[in-house]
């Protein structure tokens, strides 16, 4: 059994999604192990655009297991909307597994972040 790991070193803008989509064609599983919904890439299949933020691109293949792992930061609203969007385009996401140890971002987390940034005033990063 062999494994292929796609790892980025340019703050997420180096085109990992396109490479993973290509490699997913021959993979048994596509696993996302970290990151959140600030990521994103577009995959085009049969002239249909699929915009992915949290879901692994393997969801476009019925015979692949797709995993959102322990280190993924999941905003439930975002992942549910993304699944609904896939369903509207005829993609069945029942091949998706979400770790029970994945991190969950709730609205109060986002509000706390906003308040902390506001409190920094001119000293923001």
Whereabouts are the PLM-identified features?
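Non-transmembrane, aqueous-exposed alpha-helical and coiled segments at domain scale
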Residues: 1-125
């Amino acid at each position: 059994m062999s494994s292929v790991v796609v790892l980025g070193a340019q703050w997420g803008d180096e085109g990992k999604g396109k490479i993973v989509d290509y490699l997913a064609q021959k993979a048994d599983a596509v696993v996302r192990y970290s990151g959140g919904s600030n990521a994103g890439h577009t995959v085009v299949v049969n002239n249909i655009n699929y915009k992915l933020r949290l879901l692994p691109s393997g969801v476009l293949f019925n015979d692949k297991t797709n995993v959102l792992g322990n280190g993924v930061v999941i905003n439930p609203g975002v992942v549910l909307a993304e699944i609904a969007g896939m369903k509207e385009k005829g993609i069945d996401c029942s091949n998706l597994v979400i770790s029970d140890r994945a991190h969950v971002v709730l609205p109060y987390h986002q509000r706390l972040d906003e308040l902390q940034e506001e409190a920094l005033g001119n000293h923001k990063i």
